Curated annotation (Swiss-Prot):
It catalyses: (S)-4-amino-5-oxopentanoate + tRNA(Glu) + NADP(+) = L-glutamyl-tRNA(Glu) + NADPH + H(+). NCBIfam families: hemA (TIGR01035). It is found in: Plastid, Chloroplast. The record marks 192 as: Important for activity. Its EC number is 1.2.1.70. This is Glutamyl-tRNA reductase 2, chloroplastic.
Length: 542
């Protein structure tokens, strides 16, 4: 590490017995201390000028110096530490990370606090990308999961920042989040999203609604700053995987959904003698509500009350042809509930629609037992948790659907292996595409470098030949120079390609990239990462 003190450049290094004296192009003499460097050492009672590049000095492999970063005037030593590769976390490759909670890892009591309505997905992406180590982001929030997908400039720092963001937003302590969270990186994160899209990670194996929700993430993210190339590419590929798995394995044939499982659960919990005469009420006529109505009709229900904010959504339900649907506005919810035996709730309300005090005042249900049945598949829940304390009701939420799903799951487990094979193939394709992005800046700058040389030499040649050169000859000379440049570029660029169709590993390709960066001084390597983090730090100080 180098700092200027009275014309003397001082280098700090970690202790090592070996050292080859550096020969530098700096005009100032170099002094080397064999001691650990700390933030206070960066100040050295003088202005910090940067960090000395190990590439420019012949050194022992065990002598550690850090690469040069040209700093803006006025940055403090701490800011230098944040924005340079002295920070060990910035030496990592940019990572895809998923952080979240789902039905397998956390109870609904936690998930509902973290739930993010669709309207808040775009501003949520903006908040996440404003964090120092987050470059891109996406939000997937359903009744069964709340997952944040990010492109992190540093795994460790990125995870810390996103976890703190989730804690601040939900009011859940970080320690509690860490007990229940899903935390996956790169290939594992990619595989997880592909399994989610294929319906393999759903409460109901193979259910189709999750694919529509993944599609909605892409639709909502279009044009949102922060939903950029890597994250959008990941989600678009996940949609391809979801479609392919369903087409090639038929894993969704005859499949349950959360809505169908809710209807079946209600059927199981009702006394057999009351099933045919039970009065049914559905609260909400959105996607989930319409599916509940559809499955009620499939089970033989021909009359129900639907409570919703507007009547248009109720009228749009296709299953209305042979069914008597009685629409009631939301203001009549308690009056309708007093006459209902089974109540399904499936709205996006952030606050409970039924409290303990409300339900306690309702008359007994008309079933054999007199108990009113609530099936709440909303997250956040529409039925307050305290309602289950009442002896006159039975309350079930989305987590209680597991017992219904278990029997259905066995029939499709054989298809999971086929689906995993497809997912494995698609992971390889996606990672080849993602890895190819690593070398794109180098390829572009290398082409531009060669083009500048070609154009300059062409101008010299044409000027020497005089102004009276026939146009045909000029075109021929230009084409010749282009041909030579392209043939010279072909070999190196082929060794920078990462399309998954050759035997070169990513490490080999990255080594080739670093070599070309060094040879032609393209500076597209770690400096890109450093610039991104530095820019975020500086924006945060304004």
């Amino acid at each position: 590490m180098a700092a200027a003190v009275g014309g003397l450049t001082t280098c700090f290094a970690r202790p090592t017995p070996e050292f080859i004296a550096p020969s530098t192009s700096y005009s100032a003499p170099v002094r080397v201390f064999f001691k650990p460097f700390k933030v206070r050492d960066l100040c050295c009672a003088g202005e910090v000028v940067g960090v000395l590049s190990a590439r420019s000095i012949p050194i022992s492999p065990r002598f550690e110096l850090i690469r040069l970063v040209r700093m803006q005037p006025g940055l403090s030593a701490l800011e230098l530490l944040k924005t340079s590769s002295v920070n060990r976390y910035t030496k990592e490759r940019i990572s895809i990370v998923v952080i979240g909670l789902n039905v397998h890892t956390a109870p609904v009591e936690l998930r509902e606090k973290l739930a993010i309505p669709e309207a808040q997905w775009p501003p949520g992406i903006g908040e996440l990308c404003a964090l120092n180590h987050i470059e891109e982001a996406a939000v997937l929030s359903t009744c069964n999961r709340i997952e944040i997908y990010v492109v992190a400039l540093s795994q460790h720092r990125g995870v810390k920042e996103v976890t703190e963001w989730m804690s601040k937003r939900s009011g859940i302590p970080i320690s509690e989040l860490c007990k229940h969270r899903v935390l996956l990186y790169n290939t594992d994160a990619t595989q997880h999203l592909f399994e989610v899209s294929a319906g393999l990670d759903s409460l109901v194996l193979g259910e189709g609604q999750i694919l529509a929700q993944v599609k909605h993430v892409v639709k909502t993210g279009q044009g949102v700053a922060g939903f950029d190339r890597k994250i959008s590419g990941l989600f678009k590929h996940a949609i391809t995987v979801g479609k392919r798995v369903r087409t090639e394995t038929n894993i969704s044939s005859g499949s349950f959904s959360v809505s169908s499982a809710a209807v079946e659960l209600a059927q199981k919990k009702l006394p057999e003698s009351s099933y045919a005469t039970a009065k049914v009420m559905v609260v909400g006529a959105g996607k989930m509500g319409k599916l509940v109505i559809k499955h009620l009709v499939a089970k033989g229900c021909r009359k129900m009350v639907v409570v919703n904010r507007t009547q248009d959504s109720v009228d749009a339900v296709e299953e209305l042809k042979d069914v008597e649907i009685i629409y009631k506005p939301l203001s009549k919810i308690l009056a309708c509930a007093s006459e209902a035996d089974v109540i399904f709730t499936c709205t996006a309300s952030k606050t409970p629609l039924f409290t303990k005090e409300h339900v306690a005042m309702l008359p007994p249900a008309g079933t054999e037992t007199g108990r009113r049945l609530f099936v709440d598949i909303s997250v956040p829940r529409n039925v307050e948790q305290r309602v289950s304390d009442l002896e006159t009701v039975s309350v079930f939420n989305v987590d209680d659907l597991k017992e219904v799903v278990a029997a259905n799951k066995e029939d499709r487990l054989k298809k999971v292996q086929e689906a995993q094979s497809i997912i494995g193939e698609e992971i390889n394709k996606f990672e080849a595409w993602r890895d190819s992005l690593e070398t794109v800046p180098t390829i572009k700058k290398f082409r531009a470098y060669v083009e500048r040389i070609r154009a300059a030499e062409l101008d010299k040649c044409l000027s020497k030949m005089g102004e009276d050169i026939p146009k045909k000859k000029k075109v021929a000379i230009n084409d010749l120079s282009l041909g030579i440049a392209n043939k010279l570029l072909h070999g190196p660029i082929q060794h920078l390609r990462c399309d998954g169709n050759d035997s070169r590993t990513l490490d080999e390709i990255l080594q080739n990239m670093h070599a070309i960066n060094r040879m032609f001084d393209l500076e597209t390597d770690l400096s890109v990462l450093e610039e991104k983090i530095r820019a975020k730090v500086e924006r945060g100080q304004k």
